[in-house]
Amino acid sequence: MILQALVQYYEDLLANGKITRPGWTSAKVSWALELDENGQLMALHPLQQEEKRGKKTVLAPCQLQVPEQVKRSSGVAANFLCDNSAYMLGIDGKGKPERAMQCFAAAKELHLAILQNVPGQAAQAVQNFFINWDPKAAEQNPALEQSLKELYKGGNLVFLIRENYVQDDPEIQEAWQRQCDKNTDAPEIRCLVTGQKAPLARLHPAIKGVTGAQSSGASIVSFNADAFCSYGHEQGGNAPVGSYAAFAYAQALNYLLADREHVQRVGDTTIVCWAAGGETAYQQVAMDALFAMDAPVSESDVRNAVDKLVHGQSVEWQNVTLDPQRHFYVLGLAPNAARLSVRFFWQDTFQTLLDNVQKHYDRLEIVRPAYDKFPRLGVYWLLQETVNTNSRSPSAAPQLAGDVLRAILNNTRYPATLLDGVMMRIRAEQKVTRGRAAIIKAYYLRNEDPRCPKEVLTVENNKETNYQPYVMGQLFAVLEAIQMAVNPDINTTIKDRYFNAAASTPATVFPTILMLAQKHMQKMSKPQKIYYDKQIAALAGGKLEGSFPARLTLPEQGAFILGYYHQTQERYTKKVEE
C-alpha cells in the first residue's frame, strides 16, 4: 500500500512537471526545430524566456523534460531528441565542420536505431529528417539563415511537430523506455507494486532526509543477510519490485523529504504527507492542523478553512480549490541502522484527516493560564509533557510518538503509555501544567472509564458535580490558596509535600491539611476568613459524603488532578480580572 501510494504520487508529480521520470531529465532548451509530417524542417522557434537575475532581465532557456543525457568528455556521444546544433543539424560555427559531421552521424545512427519500427507520425518524421537532412546545405536553409548567429552561441534543440514536442509523444516515450531497459540484465518479474512485468530491482534506491538515519541514505526494502531470504531468492528477489516502481517510489519519497517546509519530526519519527494530485496546498493545511505549526495566514483563517472542509465543503486556499474528498496520506519513518522503520501509514480522505484531528484538539481544549498564548497544543508539546527535562537526553520515548499520532489520525484510543508518562511526571514534579491536564482530559474522553466520568472532563471548573475525587482536587486547590494567601512569599506549599499522597491516598493526608488550613485562617482578616470558610464548607461539607477514601484508582487520580487544575485556574483568572 505504501509503495503503491508513493508510485502514484510520483506519477502525479510527473504529470505536473515537478519531477523526472526514469531515463529522463530536466534540461535547458533554447530552440525547437519544427518538422512537418514528412520530416522537412519548417521553422526554428526560440524557446528562451525572460528571467529576472538581480536587477537585470535576461533571456534564459526554458526547462523541459527530455531523455536522459550522456556525460560527455572529449569523445562523440549523441543524446536522444535533445542536443546542440552539431548533433541535431551538423553545424556549430566553431570552424570544425568535420567534427560537426561526425556528431550528426552519431545522432543519426542513434535515432534511426531507437525509432526503427516505432509506429506514429512523430517517429517517422524524425527518421525522415535524419535520413534526408544535408548538413552541408544547412546554412542556406530558409528556416535557419535568419537565426544562425544566435544558434551558433550554443544551446539545446528539440523537435516540434504540430505544436507538440516529439519527446512527449507516447509511442516515442515507450521506445525510449525499451532502450533504457536494454541496459539491464535483471530478470523479468511480475512487479508486486504495479502488477506489470518489469525488470527486477535487485537493490532499491536510498532514501535520504530521515532524521537519525545514515546521511548517505537508508532503505525501506532491503535483504542483506541469508536469514531474511527465502525460496533461494537473493536481495530484491524476495520482494519482487520492478525497477520502474523502485525508482518511482524512491524519487517521490526523496522529493517529499527534501521539502523541509512540509516535513515534521516528532520524537525519532520523521513525518511526511501528501495528497493525490500533488498539490502542496493540502500539505500546508494538514501540517498546520495536525502539528499546530505557524502558518503564513492567521489562526482564524486556518480554523475557518478546516471547519468548512470537515463539513464537506470545498475551500479556496492559495489559488487551489481544496477538495474534502481528495485522498490523503501520512507516513511516519524512523531510523533503524541502514534501514528505515515504518512507524505508521495512514490513508483516507482529506476530510477524514481534518475531522479526526479536529476531534483530537476538541478533546484537548481546556482553560489555560493568561500567559499561555498558544490556542492549540501541538503533538510535539504534548509529548514533551512526558519528558524529564533534567535528563541527559530529554526526549519522548521513541515508540510513543508513533502511537500517539496513529491514535490521532485514526481517532482511536490514546496509548496508555501517554497517560502513564504524564502521571509519572506529575508525581515526580508535583506540577500540573495545562498540557498535562489537557492530556488527562483528552485521554478519558476517548478512553472512557466510569471512574473518570464526563462530568469532570470539562473545559472549565465544574461547580455542579459531586464526584468525590474531582471535588477533593478542588478542595486541595482551595487549601493551597489559603496557605498562599497567608504566606504570599512562601517557596513551597502543601502541593510540594502532600499532593501525591492526597491524589492517591486522601484519607492519610486530608485531615492534616484541613487542620493546617484552620491554623492559617486564624491569621486572616475576617472577610477573607469568611470567604474561604464558605469555600471549604461548600466542598468538604456539602459535597464530600462521609470520610475520605483510603485509596484512589488511576482514573480517580485523573479526576482529582483535573479538579485541582480547574479550581487553581479559576483562582488565577479572578486575580487577572481584578
Residues covered by each model-derived region:
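Conserved phosphate-interacting/catalytic interface
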Residues: 1-189, 228-578
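Short Cys/His-rich metal-coordination motifs, predominantly Zn2+-binding knuckles/fingers
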Residues: 194-196
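Short microdomains enriched in Cys/His and/or Lys/Arg
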Residues: 202-238
